[in-house]
């Protein structure tokens, strides 16, 4: 970056250019921070209150590991593959959100925006400001839908996005999805 003093007088950027850059950086950081906080809130809610079934049983995972151990591959590769297969039995946030989608509590499109945004925001990937606004609104809508279902609210509510306000219907959380 070139400093204003190093540029000839007739080519120096104006003070307003620098202030505009600063304002843009602050606004982008603000939107990113809000989106990340909302995304983490979704993760906390589903981790603490929602349960889902593992994709594979312990027996299936054990069988997969046995097959992997029979491979003629370096020990490091076999170990890595066994760890990846073990993770198939883990019930993570995405699996819990999928259970909520399947129950009609949350919208699959918002979960997709949340998932993409959460990874980008948590790992410091740059994005356009409007993407962070979309991520924030999707995460807030997920929070509202999850909280309303946890409260066993059965009725209308409004979700907001950059496209506008949408009428939606909340349904109570099925008992089999509620952590005891």
Residue ranges and their predicted role:
Residues 1-180:
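Amphipathic, oligomerization/interface secondary-structure segments
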